[in-house]
Amino acid sequence: MEKTQSVFIRFIVNGSLVKQILIGLVAGIVLALVSTPAAIAVGLLGSLFVGALKAVAPVLVLMLVIASIANHKKGQKTSIRPILFLYVLGTFSAALVAVVVSFIYPSTLILVAESADITPPSGIVEVLHGLLNSIIANPIHALLNANYIGILAWAVGLGIALRHAADTTKALINDMSDAVTLVVRVVIRFAPLGIFGLVASTIAATGFGALQLYAQLLVVLIGCMLLVALVVNPLIVYWKIRRNPYPLVFACLRESGVTAFFTRSSAANIPVNMEMCKKMNLNEDTYSISIPLGATINMAGAAITITVLTLAAVHTLGITVDLPTALLLSVVAAICACGASGVAGGSLLLIPLACSMFGIPNDVAMQVVGVGFIIGVLQDSAETALNSSTDVLFTAAVCQAEDAKLANPDPLAAGKSV
């Protein structure tokens, strides 16, 4: 009996989060079919989970950005600027693709919001005015009211100032960042229970139409990611290496993307990417920096997630978006994506920042985050696969172009697969 309990506890604490979320998803559907009152009652679990996310997200953004900027090392001579440019170009292109696809195939979410609470901006001028006012907000006020734009502004400013701090101070900042990340991981471990409550109460209240809407949203998300992985990224790589990019693209998807799909963490996939770069005989001084950096800031998949879910919320609430505002959303989504920082589900926690552009209240934005967690079993896995495989793809493209030595048609021909 004790052995059985030990195995069960080990599965709950250390088991696969993907499997647990799937179990919660199925259990929520079954409960909604069996007992509508019970399904509505367990909606409390979903509310508590979303509330915990709402509480921890502002602190997470603040500490991750401060730690990242404060610990940037000077004097590292590498050819990283071209790779950094590709990271930025790829992330912005992904957000742009997501905007276009979302306009062609708009998605609708099940949200609980009163139209009186929504004050949409009239155009790009009002959006910029709101952004500027958000930037100069009091930092404590920004944290209390989940003003993510103000939080980002203060985090960047403090991070730059703390780059000149003593090593002990930087170590303390790193420890604080790690502590907040640990809290986030603990909260996310409760995702199966939260999703169980969200799915059960949603189906009980709205019927299976909600799942069909989420299925459409998932198709749009995965479709955008496939479009970026198989069309946009190859075009960028071809522009850099001037030859058929698909052998390199497919090698990166095969060697890096598959493992990242299951780990659901760009940071956890860094050793795999490092080994792949080594087998392709790339410049070690370059990839030893670009791969960890890419795990933090190269977030094409996150940009897609933020953009698609934000525009889905906008469409659901009936807010009209003009072209300049949509382009600005692409920029904001690309910047937001850089804050995902390799944490599983991290991009979902940054959706409220993009939603704030359109006057969407934080409570409604966190409902969008809840929707993201419902579809996150596939969404987060596909997002991480795109993010991590793009790290090694762009690093290899720049290294091969700058070495002026084009590799064999199969970039891993000289060595076996990882």
From Swiss-Prot:
Keywords: Amino-acid transport, Cell inner membrane, Cell membrane, Membrane, Symport, Transmembrane, Transmembrane helix, Transport. Gene3D superfamilies: Sodium:dicarboxylate symporter. It holds the Pfam family SDF. One of its GO terms (molecular function) is neutral L-amino acid:sodium symporter activity. It is a multi-pass membrane protein. GO terms for cellular component: plasma membrane. It catalyses: L-serine(in) + Na(+)(in) = L-serine(out) + Na(+)(out); L-threonine(in) + Na(+)(in) = L-threonine(out) + Na(+)(out). Its main location: membrane. The chain crosses the membrane at residues 21-41, 49-69, 83-103, 142-162, 190-210, 217-237, 299-319, 331-351. NCBIfam families: PRK13628.1. This is Serine/threonine transporter SstT. It comes from Yersinia pestis. The lineage of its organism: Bacteria, Pseudomonadati, Pseudomonadota, Gammaproteobacteria, Enterobacterales.
